[in-house]
Amino acid sequence: MQVLPPSSTGGPSRLFIMRPVATTLLMVAILLAGIIGYRFLPVAALPEVDYPTIQVVTLYPGASPDVMTSAVTAPLERQFGQMSGLKQMSSQSSGGASVVTLQFQLTLPLDVAEQEVQAAINAATNLLPSDLPNPPVYSKVNPADPPIMTLAVTSTAMPMTQVEDMVETRVAQKISQVSGVGLVTLSGGQRPAVRVKLNAQAIAALGLTSETVRAAITSANVNSAKGSLDGPTRAVTLSANDQMQSVDEYRQLIIAWQNGAPVRLGDVATVEQGAENSWLGAWANKEQAIVMNVQRQPGANIISTADSIRQMLPQLTESLPKSVNVTVLSDRTTNIRASVTDTQFELMLAIALVVMIIYLFLRNVPATIIPGVAVPLSLIGTFAVMVFLDFSINNLTLMALTIATGFVVDDAIVVIENISRYIEKGEKPLAAALKGAGEIGFTIISLTFSLIAVLIPLLFMGDIVGRLFREFAVTLAVAILISAVVSLTLTPMMCARMLSQASLRKQNRFSRAAEKMFDRVIEKYGQWLAKVLNHPWLTLSVALGTLLLSIMLWVFIPKGFFPVQDNGIIQGTLQAPQSSSFASMAQRQRQVSDVILKDPAVESLTAFVGVDGTNPALNSARLQINLKPLNERDDRVQKVIARLQHAVAKVPGVDLYLQPTQDLTIDTQVSRTQYQFTLQATSLDALSTWVPQLMEKLQQLPQLSDVSSDWQDKGLVAYVNVDRDSASRLGISMADVDNALYNAFGQRLISTIYTQANQYRVVLEHNTDTTPGLAAMDTIRLTSSDGGIVPLSAIAKIEQRFAPLSINHLDQFPVTTFSFNVPDNYSLGDAVQAILDTEKTVNLPVDITTQFQGSTLAFQAALGSTVWLIVAAVVAMYIVLGVLYESFIHPITILSTLPTAGVGALLALMIAGSELDVIAIIGIILLIGIVKKNAIMMIDFALAAEREQGMAPRDAIFQACLLRFRPILMTTLAALLGALPLMLSTGTGAELRRPLGIGMVGGLLVSQVLTLFTTPVIYLLFDRLSLYVKSRFPRQEEEA
């Protein structure tokens, strides 16, 4: 009968070692919970970290940017500015459109923000123009967030007006109802309408004016309540033919009588079926189309939303005629799925590599199976907690699990190695398990909690970066905790049942060769360590040198914010001279599209021209370029962008700005390039003075490329300078002048046609085909107080001036946004510093302020908090270690290993040409938790040898280094191989994962070599320091 160690042996593991059935069932429960949880986890690109954002759009056709600003945007801004929880308010007022974007604090629920926005709009209603065609409309969407899906609707047999009508009523409305959809926009502007084009000469000859015609149409088409009759026995509802539904009815409308004969609308105007706004157009590739852009609500899951739309599409397209084609041009979920799939493959590869390294060291199948079980059990069990915390399967959580592969096996390796050592000495497996697990239990707890302590600061990071990495930190911490539980329960129980002297001693040729190799390595290490211990001050100088080197590398390494991803979609802005018309812009767009579609990496293209709230001016066009899948093209997105810009540069009269779409969107405005810098003033005049000066300076900086500004103050304006005295003498008011101009040139919506399914507008304008340009102004006629017809030229002069094409505000003040990219040989940190230095040379007045926006602002915040984040991680780990060891000194010895990790990580990033971005910084913080385990394993055994065997400190630490060399090497290689697949990643989303892998592999390699020698030296130096303190201050030490 086997004699067991005393009941005190085994520590917390004893109960689980002695009760294998209960332990097995507990692990099965964890496994099942994880498997079930995995099925309920949504899939996403990144954790849901969107700011609650709402966009408010107001359309006022024909209004100038100045009118839109003063009459629409400003009243709305005053009401919105009073809302609590508002983080930032930006607006863009252009010809006929006002867009106000409201970004709220992360802590404010989107539904609460929606209620506040609706209340503010209601409060501003009385301040808005009375003839506003429609009230402001808000959408729970971030305009800078690229659409999750883009669909093109084309037809070769039907006009686009009919196509849009069907798409709007049969498709767009249904998609809008899908959970997670924030906004469905139909680009192309082919909404059906009845267009009335007045012949100015004809109405003038008849003594009529456009205002007469407008009043006639408005009064002839009404749709109002008429009442009902309630008799003794029957009730009758009243109805009438007060609605005109067709073009022919409008043509036959009598607008006046001349000499007893009717003057019909068709006599003085061309009445036709057309589009509500003729200055809007969209194209899919080279074909005119209605383009549907589907944007998600902030916080909505992209995958589930896109899947729901995909499921609906077959049913929706069946309701359309056969001649109408619906094509999915882009679907962001395709790349998201590919990225997640690649990360899942890297996770499985990491598990395989870790198990392989375990077998290489243990050279025993049963001993390899034990930690091989611990790895998937710890990772799968994490899924159950992720479901409970509303996490998702995304790139960051999968990266956390991939890194955790190397972490979770560490505990099991330490336990197995210690138990195996006692079995090899002749102990029975059960006794060895109890003794080995009890001896190593405190070390496991120290390793676990000190590693989790490193992650604690990540949980308290503020703003969007903190939200972004919260799932990463918690997922990793949960996996480590489950690993510790498994290592103290299942692992020693399996060791007691599966290991034996015979199995451990059973060796093949490979095992014997590996054993000899490890013995020689340990022997050499012992020789080198003895020499190092004889020269402690030289070793200490090396340790101090690594600290200084890490600081230097930190200062000089290029710094960035977030890796630029290749998601297969490029957003573009095409810019033409400020006086460009819709027709000329459409022609330029077609030329550019032809060039872009010839590129072998391009799969499809959508383009939009016109002003509708998303596009600020007629001289710009929006492009979305969809690339072929990564495995079907030779170049990544940045090279494709450079190639496209070079090719389009040959097209005269246009500038093309391109940027790849990103999963992380912090901006609230659609910009031309990736990064933004704003100049804000109290007046437009101040901006007009300083914007050109700063623009000239910024364009000269080599750290910036594609520098542009949204300041456009050279738009042509026909300024009507009315002689108010003359007008007053004739009884003509300014309202009469404005109405006449609006009727002629504003595409004025004067009436509404109501049907059972939709509503359509009647559009009034002058027919300018015969009198184009400013000559059309001579055709304007007004009615004097005595009924006479007065030409506009009799009371006004037309002056050609310049004015802004759009007016932008930030928090209610005028602002200009500079957009820029960063060249390949510079980093975002270089660009930011160059801009700050340039700003100082311009000597801006005190009433003009500058600020970075979007990801550039987040970069500044992250960079400023990085040092404090690392300090917080070190302090947190010191506190945990101090509590565990009941010592002020030993935690310092353990933490002395950290500079070596920093040097390795920073050197690896610089050699690989990677920036120090937030992903790489997370890797460095994780290294802080990993590399100290070498010191913990050494110091734990050294302290035990001093305490239990009475060994001298030098002998104790020397023996500890030799005894723990194999598990130290094994655990370090396991962590390294866990990060290796991330470092070598080449698939979709590799840009996001690679910096983490590079930093960790480099840090582990350097720290592994150095800490094996620096830790024992520092341990002995602090031991001498402790003895010195005790000898100098015996009383104080004794009291302590």
UniProtKB/Swiss-Prot annotation:
Superkingdom of the source species: Bacteria
Any GO CC annotation of this UniProt entry: plasma membrane
Membrane topology: Multi-pass membrane protein
Pfam families xrefs: ACR_tran
This protein's record includes keyword Transmembrane: yes
Quaternary structure and interacting proteins, as annotated: Part of a tripartite efflux system composed of MdtA, MdtB and MdtC. MdtB forms a heteromultimer with MdtC.
Family from the record: Belongs to the resistance-nodulation-cell division (RND) (TC 2.A.6) family. MdtB subfamily.
HAMAP family membership: MdtB
Name of the protein described by the UniProt record: Multidrug resistance protein MdtB
Species per Swiss-Prot/TrEMBL record: Citrobacter koseri (strain ATCC BAA-895 / CDC 4225-83 / SGSC4696)
